[in-house]
């Protein structure tokens, strides 16, 4: 991974992951040849009386010597980067709560080499990635004023084995807290228990050499990181059917170990790929997570994970799918369009209707006032046709410029991609409302042309059941719940004459305002969830209005809800509407649509009204993206096939 250097003070990266691959003469610093030893390798020199690294680290999240100057702290250099190095005491104490490793900040390129025995003088500090006010933990450092090399070529301290056969991290608890405990700052006290709390377990190893034996990947390579489980996953939490690990309510799987390419290149890996033997590195902290900065490139063993395909819908089955296109525009490389076409044609077997999110305007991230998406969609439809798929059509509502959040100028929106050769038709109603509206809910005045980007779709009672005043139409676009984010889109379709109301959309994503799981505030606050709760309320209100106009109305809500099936916003939507979230009917170990940091989770959903849920149906998550390097971060599409007669 190519890392960019960011400086928080002179020569200072905010965290190691941004200081990491500067090269000298084409050779990464971490793998530059060690300087020749001045003499035969010898054990580290005896330490002078004074402070040791475990005194600097202390048993807690903040050094007891923070702000103090320490002199001639001994250690062996274990890794080197552009403006500092890690060192470890070869003579540890017996307290597993105090780390024996530390990062030494030198401001400029250090002159030491791996396996040098050194004495360091400097000021102890706590460096917080993201700035002093961020929710990240601090990393204990020595801001060096003097570094004396005592000997070259000394043995490295042995690494701590993580997992079975070594020091085992807690497998469910990041930080134990009383029920309903308010959020507090762990750096200001509250106990330190590495045996039971994963946050403390990894803190007690900060800066030390660690080893992972026979690692298995539980997430794909992404941004230079690979989440793995030691010992092939022995003793870990619930595994997915395809080799990942399942995120559960109250269990974020802290036994995961994240390998980082900060010091040496790492192989591209998919879920289930393995690293046989040992993988060594230095445990570091940056931007909300502990990572192992690997010091020698391991060899990958292919796990053979296939990309899934679903079965084709049969005659009489309506197939409805979800697809997150993650910022698609005409600027997107042709290979991406081809891959998406493969998802539709091969993976999903060309469903009748796809609720789509993430479509950008015709100029992508160019902030030029463009909001139309016809060129973006035309390229996608062409790619589907070239892949052997049927002719698709498209409906969406262009947003007002820069009103829907996302990348600046991109104007992402939701939409409906559909085929009409199997009995599905889209009901276009751009103005005026349905012609058969009942007298107590008359159509809009003839000739009225509301701006669909800001006009809320209404449910209209007709002689044949509930219909929409606009199709497609946006749900409560003026509601504060949708401020600076995409608006949900409702559409009216017919299947062999049977009317169905479909809602597509993406709920507010997790943001930088959410506190990290491995941060200083426990339990972490997630303000983005508050937005999703408000959005769930808005969508639920719309669905209730549809069902109030026709108790047996056919309703489908589908898309990227950015929430897990057990989370409060999704639970609120189902409880307030009577909809069934189909993900809850799928096997727990095979319902995930995303893999985040190695945790498999369900963020994309299809929900059915009772009238459809009673019909014979089959739901499938088609794992084609989230578990693979190259498509990491993209969602797996989902599809439901409903045996549905017409009317």
Segments and roles (model prediction):
Residues 46-323, 327-353, 434-437, 450-487, ...:
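Extended non-catalytic accessory segments flanking core domains
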Residues 7-10, 38-48, 220-221, 227-229, ...:
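Intrinsically disordered, low-complexity polar segments enriched in Ser/Thr/Pro and acidic
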Residues 14-16, 49-55, 375-379, 580-581:
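Secondary-structure junction/capping motif
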Residues 22-26, 36, 72, 119, ...:
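A generic alpha-helix preference that emphasizes hydrophobic side chains
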Residues 1-42:
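Secretory targeting and sorting signals
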Residues 293-647:
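Divalent cation-coordinating acidic motifs and surrounding scaffolds
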């Amino acid at each position: 991974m190519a890392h960019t250097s960011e400086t928080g003070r002179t020569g200072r990266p905010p965290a190691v992951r941004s200081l990491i691959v500067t090269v000298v003469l084409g050779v990464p610093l971490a793998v530059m040849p060690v300087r020749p030893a001045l003499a035969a390798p010898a054990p580290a020199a005896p330490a002078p009386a004074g402070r040791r690294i475990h005194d600097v680290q202390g048993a807690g999240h903040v050094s007891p010597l923070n702000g103090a100057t320490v002199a001639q702290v001994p250690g062996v250099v274990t890794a080197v980067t552009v403006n500092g190095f890690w060192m470890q005491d070869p003579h540890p104490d017996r307290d597993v709560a105090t780390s024996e490793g530390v990062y030494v900040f030198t401001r400029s390129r250090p002159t030491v080499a791996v396996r040098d025995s050194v004495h360091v003088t400097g000021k102890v500090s706590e460096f917080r990635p993201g700035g002093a006010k961020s929710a990240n933990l601090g990393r204990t450092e020595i801001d060096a004023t003097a570094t004396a090399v005592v000997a070259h070529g000394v043995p490295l301290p042995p690494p701590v084995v993580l997992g079975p056969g070594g020091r085992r991290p807690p497998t469910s608890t990041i930080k134990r807290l009383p029920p309903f405990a308010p959020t507090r700052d762990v750096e200001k006290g509250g106990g330190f228990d590495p045996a039971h709390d994963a946050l403390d377990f990894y803190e007690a190893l900060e800066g030390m050499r660690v080893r992972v034996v026979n690692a298995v990947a539980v997430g794909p390579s992404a941004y230079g990181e690979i989440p793995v489980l030691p010992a092939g996953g022995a003793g870990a939490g619930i595994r997915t059917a395809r080799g990942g690990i399942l995120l559960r309510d109250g269990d974020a799987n802290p036994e995961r170990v994240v390998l980082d390419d900060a010091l040496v290149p790492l192989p591209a890996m998919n879920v289930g790929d393995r690293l046989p033997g040992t993988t060594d590195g230095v445990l570091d902290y940056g931007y909300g997570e502990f990572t192992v900065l690997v010091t020698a490139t391991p060899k990958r063993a292919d796990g053979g994970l296939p990309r899934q395909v679903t079965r084709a819908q049969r005659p009489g089955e309506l197939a409805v799918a979800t697809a997150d296109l993650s910022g698609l525009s005409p600027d997107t490389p042709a290979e991406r369009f081809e891959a998406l076409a493969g998802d539709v044609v091969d993976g999903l077997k060309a469903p009748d209707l796809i609720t789509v999110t993430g479509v950008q305007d015709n100029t992508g991230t160019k902030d030029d006032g463009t909001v139309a998406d016809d060129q973006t969609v035309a390229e996608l439809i062409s790619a589907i046709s070239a892949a052997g798929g049927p002719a698709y059509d498209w409906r969406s509502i262009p947003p007002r410029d820069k009103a829907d959040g996302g990348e600046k100028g991109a104007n992402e929106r939701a939409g409906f991609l559909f085929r009409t050769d199997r009995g599905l038709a889209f009901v276009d109603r751009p103005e005026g409302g349905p012609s058969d509206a009942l007298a107590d809910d008359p159509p809009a005045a003839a000739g009225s042309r509301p701006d669909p980007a800001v006009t809320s779709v209404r449910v209209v009672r007709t002689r044949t059941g509930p219909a929409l005043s606009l199709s497609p139409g946006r749900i409560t676009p003026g509601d504060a719940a949708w401020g600076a984010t995409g608006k949900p889109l409702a559409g009216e379709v017919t299947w062999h004459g049977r009317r169905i109301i479909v809602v597509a959309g993406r709920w507010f994503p997790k943001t930088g305002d959410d506190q990290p799981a491995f941060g200083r505030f426990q339990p972490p606050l997630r303000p983005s969830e508050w937005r999703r709760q408000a959005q769930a309320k808005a969508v639920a209100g719309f669905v209730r209005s549809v069902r109030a106009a026709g108790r047996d109305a056919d309703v489908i809500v589908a898309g990227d809800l950015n929430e897990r099936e057990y989370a409060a916003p999704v639970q609120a939507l189902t409880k307030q509407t009577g909809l069934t979230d189909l993900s809850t009917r799928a096997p727990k170990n095979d319902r995930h649509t995303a893999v985040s940091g190695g945790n498999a989770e369900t963020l994309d959903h299809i929900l059915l009204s009772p009238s459809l849920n009673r019909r014979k149906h089959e739901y499938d998550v088609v794992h084609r993206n989230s578990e693979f390097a190259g498509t990491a971060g993209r969602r797996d599409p989902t599809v439901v096939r409903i045996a549905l007669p017409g009317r």
